[in-house]
Amino acid sequence: MSKNIVVLPGDHVGKEVTDEAIKVLNAIAEVRPEIKFNFQHHLIGGAAIDATGTPLPDEALEASKKADAVLLGAVGGPKWGTGAVRPEQGLLKIRKELGLYANLRPCNFASDSLLDLSPLKPEYAKGTDFVVVRELVGGIYFGERKEDEGDGVAWDSEKYSVPEVQRITRMAAFLALQQNPPLPIWSLDKANVLASSRLWRKTVEETIKTEFPQLTVQHQLIDSAAMILVKSPTKLNGVVITNNMFGDIISDEASVIPGSLGLLPSASLASLPDTNKAFGLYEPCHGSAPDLPANKVNPIATILSAAMMLKLSLDLVEEGRALEEAVRNVLDAGVRTGDLGGSNSTTEVGDAIAKAVKEILA
């Protein structure tokens, strides 16, 4: 059983965290000899700009199109600024070219032992468990725009079509139906102001009503949802669906609840994972952390992204769950990087998780 994975380390800590994810995947292959992971490394982001002049070289894109999944580290940094050619353009391009229309970002505690690290009081944070499903290839980030050309005027445009909203709604519904009873769906918009949000709300409502009558959907204005998230996040438990820009913002807000950006994974999918073989790109929610010393970054977000990859793209559900259990066991044992109040290095955390997952699967 051979699985082809393109690795895009990216910039700064990107290589460190992807190295640790590869380490734990190889540990799984050691105890499951029928599984073989083939890793192919390519450039993206600032590293690609330095080497080739473009944030996403053609060979990286073509290799990604042929892979079973893509594992990405982190992109960007102050070195490359905000000029005409920027590292982040590589991310936008690969999402669009690979049709990665749905971004999944879980918000929960990898271990309850981390509750005291949350900026929220434990009694409010405990039990938080939702996934943000963000539409990733439409909306204002891909709309028509005008730069300031000396006239002091610039603008961006938000545009959504019914098929785009239906597609992301079906992804949210699929995820909700994976639990028994099904999870509630929360749809976030700004329908009291924006025409695109009114189309969004209408389409989400009709899609759920006609295609998934067993599910419930509740609509929430994005600003109200942002308040709920810091006041009582468990009220949003279930599946949270929203557009590209709102999803970008609300998922970053949610990411601090578990106490560290170094804990949260993400998946960007091109299709429903109904056979556990959806093509996807997996990356941590944190950035490239250019100021962080070597061997200090928390690799858990990337390792948990690899666990999502095992479950959603590589049809290795048991192994993915084992990896999540290994992470929980290691955290409970107190093996932690500095962002979690520990003193362990990046490689020490990776080593501990690799050992733990082998013990679970042996």
From Swiss-Prot:
The keyword NAD applies. SUPFAM superfamilies: Isocitrate/Isopropylmalate dehydrogenase-like (SSF53659). One of its GO terms (biological process) is L-leucine biosynthetic process. PROSITE patterns: IDH_IMDH. Its cofactor is Mg(2+); Mn(2+). This is 3-isopropylmalate dehydrogenase. Its main location: cytoplasm. Homodimer. NAD(+) binds at residues 77-88, 287-298. The record marks Y141, K190 as: Important for catalysis. Pfam families: Iso_dh. InterPro entries: IsoCit/isopropylmalate_DH_CS (IPR019818), IsoPropMal-DH-like_dom (IPR024084), Isopropylmalate_DH (IPR004429). The gene is LEU2. Substrate binds at R95, R105, R134, D223. It catalyses: (2R,3S)-3-isopropylmalate + NAD(+) = 4-methyl-2-oxopentanoate + CO2 + NADH. The lineage of its organism: Eukaryota, Fungi, Dikarya, Ascomycota, Saccharomycotina. Keywords: Amino-acid biosynthesis, Branched-chain amino acid biosynthesis, Cytoplasm, Leucine biosynthesis, Magnesium, Manganese, Metal-binding, NAD, Oxidoreductase. Mg(2+) binds at D223, D248, D252. Belongs to the isocitrate and isopropylmalate dehydrogenases family. GO terms for cellular component: cytosol. Catalyzes the oxidation of 3-carboxy-2-hydroxy-4-methylpentanoate (3-isopropylmalate) to 3-carboxy-4-methyl-2-oxopentanoate. The product decarboxylates to 4-methyl-2 oxopentanoate. It is an enzyme of class 1 (oxidoreductase). It is found in: Cytoplasm. GO terms for molecular function: 3-isopropylmalate dehydrogenase activity; magnesium ion binding; NAD binding. Binds 1 Mg(2+) or Mn(2+) ion per subunit. Its EC number is 1.1.1.85. Pathway: Amino-acid biosynthesis; L-leucine biosynthesis; L-leucine from 3-methyl-2-oxobutanoate: step 3/4. It comes from the Eukaryota.
